[in-house]
Design a protein with these regions (language model features):
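Cyclophilin-like peptidyl-prolyl cis-trans isomerases
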Residues: 1-191
Length: 191
């Protein structure tokens, strides 16, 4: 059995994700490492692009401990065939050549063939797609973003993830493989 992550929302709803370690082992390990430390708890969802995705964070969940990059999953594991990105998946965001975010998951709201092999699918939603579609429709406002051409809209009323609860099915997961060096995206400003 695969591990699961349950996102408990402040409105009483929940989103349950089956994690897919066979499809994206390092990405799953990274998500588990961050969620297991509680760094995703009490977080306001930061970016909603209707018709495209619900992006939980682009600032490493406001935790320095989450502000690390991991290698492209399919460079690290070339034997794995990337999964298709579509509604019902959860993917890990990233920063191009710099690498993948250690923990900046997003839920696609459309088929995203351009993500295959770039932003790994590391889980599938097994409960709570109605909540993801509700989030797509909340009122948002545009916010400045340091990367030209990237649309960032945050909810007018905060949509809070109260906590993320992991069920690892009795397995242990090691810390993720991280990118060497100290390059960081412009969005990770903790000063």
């Amino acid at each position: 059995m695969n591990p699961t992550a349950t996102f408990y929302m402040a409105n009483g709803k929940k989103i349950v994700v089956e994690l897919l370690p066979e499809s994206a082992p390092n990405t799953v390990a990274s998500f588990i490492w961050c969620a297991g430390h509680g760094w995703l708890d009490n977080h306001a969802i930061q970016r909603i692009v209707p018709g495209s995705w619900v992006d939980l964070s682009y600032e490493a969940f406001h935790h320095k401990e989450c502000a690390y990059l991991i290698p492209n999953e399919f460079t690290l594991h070339p034997e794995i065939t990337p999964l298709e990105s579509h509604p019902g998946c959860v993917c890990m965001g990233g920063y191009g050549e710099m690498g993948l975010a250690g923990c900046e998951p997003f839920f696609p709201l459309r088929d995203c063939p351009e993500h295959k092999g770039v932003y790994p699918v590391f889980g599938k939603v097994i409960e709570g797609m109605d909540e993801i579609y509700r989030l797509e429709k909340v009122d948002t406002k545009p916010v400045p973003f340091p990367y030209p051409g990237v649309v960032v809209n945050e909810p007018l009323q905060p949509e809070i993830i109260e906590k993320v609860v992991l069920d690892l099915k009795g397995r242990e997961y090691l810390e993720p493989v991280r990118m060497p060096g100290d390059k960081k995206p412009a969005t990770w400003n903790f000063d």
